[in-house]
Swiss-Prot record:
GO cellular component: mitochondrion
Lineage per the UniProt record: Eukaryota, Fungi, Dikarya, Ascomycota, Saccharomycotina
One Pfam family here: Tubulin_3
Classification via SUPFAM superfamilies: Tubulin nucleotide-binding domain-like (SSF52490)
Record-given protein name: Protein DML1
Length: 468
């Protein structure tokens, strides 16, 4: 067994993980599939059945789990609506403390709980929370919550706010980094992470999914640093959400204080996470769409990449080495461990899922960008697999995926020259605008050194000033 644990950090990331596990759910009926890579099997010897819970650790702010109680499917007393319907002494003697307005289950989740054969169609109104349409039941050890920060359902795109007062937000890299180190590190490693690790026979690695533009980037950076210190021999693939910023939109850097802060967060988080990860995937976060819809599109890429590690038992003996996270890392980096930003993220004819494709060319960059390495993930034609060509099982669609993204035949991921445009642009920006930051020179050095990893051929030394 080669288990992979998904560590999902932020509300947006939890939507992506929900979509991913919803797409895995149909595979549970296929005995040939190695479902225990991403799912933990629980065997009932009496009924001779097996149930699965996701190998996942989900981080969210308070209220981010919506109507879902941590022990809801373990103990009914964890869910307020159950108390309402109960009769007898338990309901009469129960003492309830209400700290916020109750979040009701969505019609979709109610239909799932009732075993309905026909489920309501997903839309923006009934899928505000990832728990509104989650098909699998999580183990209580999967849930982790920021105790002093609250999710605001009315402003989904905003970072969590302190004590639900909507005055101070979780929108700073340093705030997130300090929060994990000072308040959550010991408990997380000793409790929930430890419980998930105990359920693995031969862990091969972690997927880290996080946002980069706010405090979650710093939070994840500190977490990954300690994870690598604790488990240095496993693989780490990080998927970082990037919202459009002043660079991608070609706006003045100081157009607003908030936009400048977002860019500072993104730069620091990208440096920290890419340095500690085996592979780093810069995802585009579309803030104009509801979370369920945008992540329902992005899951085509995420599911395709991870389908490489989750396959047929019949083929396991013949291509087991090629279905490891470490093999994909080697195929994309070819031993150049510092050149690990996977900037080409394409699925079929859909728009690119890479944020870096939205960034303008740097002053003297060439177009198109050179491709250092590229891997194809084939989900239809089933050609023979090779080091750079992976044949996996067909895409299994879920009814929670938008109608516009119901098919997935081939994904192409690669390491290109494009990160140089991004890193050099950021290096110029840091030189000009990080005037009083204590880590200014360190960030400049990191960006300059890292950009060299993505250079190919010769460049014109006559660089005109960047108009930011």
């Amino acid at each position: 067994m080669r288990e992979i644990i998904n560590v999902s950090v932020s509300h947006r990331s939890n939507h992506l993980i929900t979509q991913f596990y919803n797409c895995l759910e149909p595979l549970l009926h296929d005995a040939d599939q190695e479902n225990d890579v991403f799912l933990n099997p629980n065997i009932d010897k009496v009924s001779k059945t097996v149930s699965y819970t996701p190998r996942a650790l989900l981080w969210d702010a308070k209220l981010g789990n919506g109507s879902l109680g941590t022990y809801q499917y373990v103990s009914e007393n964890d869910y307020a609506d159950t108390l309402d319907s109960e009769q007898g002494a338990t309901a009469k003697t129960a003492h309830r403390v209400q700290t916020h307005d109750r979040i009701r289950k969505s019609p979709y989740q109610l239909a799932l709980d009732q075993g309905a054969t026909v489920l309501p169609k997903i839309n923006d109104e009934i899928a505000k929370y990832w728990s509104d349409y989650s098909k699998l039941i999580y183990d209580p050890s999967s849930f982790n919550t920021l105790q002093d920060w609250y999710h605001d359902a009315a402003n989904q795109q905003k970072a969590p706010n302190f004590q639900n007062l909507r005055q101070v937000y979780f929108d700073n890299y340093e705030t997130g980094s300090n929060q994990f180190r000072e308040n959550y590190s010991n408990e997380f490693f000793d409790s929930n992470l430890h419980q998930q690790l105990e359920k693995c026979d031969s862990l091969q690695g972690f997927n880290i999914i996080t946002e980069l533009d706010n405090g979650w980037g710093g939070f994840s950076s500190s977490m990954l640093l300690e994870l690598k210190d604790e488990l240095p021999k496993v693989s780490y693939h990080t998927y970082g959400w990037n919202q459009d910023d002043v660079c991608s939109l070609k706006e003045p850097v100081h157009s607003t204080k908030t936009k400048f802060q977002m860019l500072c967060n993104k730069i620091r988080a990208t440096i920290a996470l890419s340095q500690e990860s085996d592979l780093f995937f810069p995802l585009y976060a579309n803030t104009k769409e509801a979370f369920w819809r945008s992540t329902g599109e992005t899951v085509l890429l995420f599911d395709s990449v991870n389908s490489v590690f989750h396959g047929s038992r019949k083929q396991a003996a013949t291509n087991s080495n090629m279905r490891k996270m470490s093999h994909l890392t080697n195929a994309l980096t070819l031993g150049e461990s510092k050149r690990n930003i996977v900037s080409k993220l394409n699925v079929d004819e859909y728009n690119s899922f890479s944020f870096y494709d939205r960034m303008p060319l740097y002053k003297n960059s060439k177009k198109p960008s050179h491709t250092f390495t590229q891997c194809e993930i084939d989900r239809v034609n089933h050609k023979e697999s090779s080091m750079f060509h992976f044949t996996t099982y067909p895409w299994t669609n879920s009814d929670t995926i938008p109608d516009t993204h119901h098919s997935c035949a081939e994904s192409v991921i690669g390491v290109t020259e494009k990160p140089r445009d991004v890193l050099k642009t950021w290096e110029d920006l840091v030189s000009r605008y990080f005037r009083y930051d204590s880590d200014r020179e360190e960030i400049k050095d990191h960006l300059g050194t890292l950009s060299l990893e993505y250079e190919h051929g010769w460049y014109d030394d006559d660089d005109s000033d960047l108009d930011l």
